[in-house]
Amino acid sequence: MASSLTCTGVIWALLSFLCAATSCVGFFMPYWLWGSQLGKPVSFGTFRRCSYPVHDESRQMMVMVEECGRYASFQGIPSAEWRICTIVTGLGCGLLLLVALTALMGCCVSDLISRTVGRVAGGIQFLGGLLIGAGCALYPLGWDSEEVRQTCGYTSGQFDLGKCEIGWAYYCTGAGATAAMLLCTWLACFSGKKQKHYPY
């Protein structure tokens, strides 16, 4: 099967897919922030949450429903910062995934990725990583929302975790973006074969 990638390009394609998958999984999982409420573990993502309080009419008290799900609407996300984070991080993950899938197709299709296309793809990866990094930087601005303060204690605020801790999905998302920005962008410059020019 013909490939439009150099040996470095094949490594770039595989690493691009790994970085994109890592960032996308981290983005989708609701484990960016860990805490507890009413004695039950609670976790948050940018647009999803695990365990939430509901009022039990029969017992006339608040109880925790231990299941994960996304917020009922985009406006239901606890803070404007998290809504922006969701859009920015989602867009960045989409760009990384687009480049990764194109790079993997370049392993099987000849003349798909030239040196110029590889460099443009690297630039798109850098932009995607930058967007995800911006989303990760925005996320702590939402820690002063009422939902987070109920879970992390009323000492929590912007960039102050209170009783909570950062979860593995936050690190996973950031690590995928960092690797895409630093490694994949550099490898992309050497990924495409030099185009052959045929005289017609």
From Swiss-Prot:
UniProt topology in membrane: Multi-pass membrane protein
Pfam family, one: L_HMGIC_fpl
Membership in a protein family: Belongs to the LHFP family.
Record-annotated disulphide pairs: none
Name the record gives this protein: LHFPL tetraspan subfamily member 6 protein
Record keywords: Chromosomal rearrangement, Membrane, Signal, Transmembrane, Transmembrane helix
Location of this chain's protein in the cell: Membrane
Upper taxonomic lineage: Eukaryota, Metazoa, Chordata, Craniata, Vertebrata
Membrane-spanning ranges: 84-104, 123-143, 166-186
GO cellular-component term (any): membrane
Primary localisation category: membrane
Residues of the signal peptide: 1-21
UniProt disease annotation: A chromosomal aberration involving LHFP is associated with a subclass of benign mesenchymal tumors known as lipomas. Translocation t(12;13)(q13-q15;q12) with HMGA2 is shown in lipomas.
PANTHER family: LHFPL TETRASPAN SUBFAMILY MEMBER 6 PROTEIN, LIPOMA HMGIC FUSION PARTNER-LIKE PROTEIN
Expressed in which tissues: Pancreas, kidney, skeletal muscle, liver, lung brain, heart, colon, small intestine, uterus, testis, prostate, thymus, spleen and placenta.
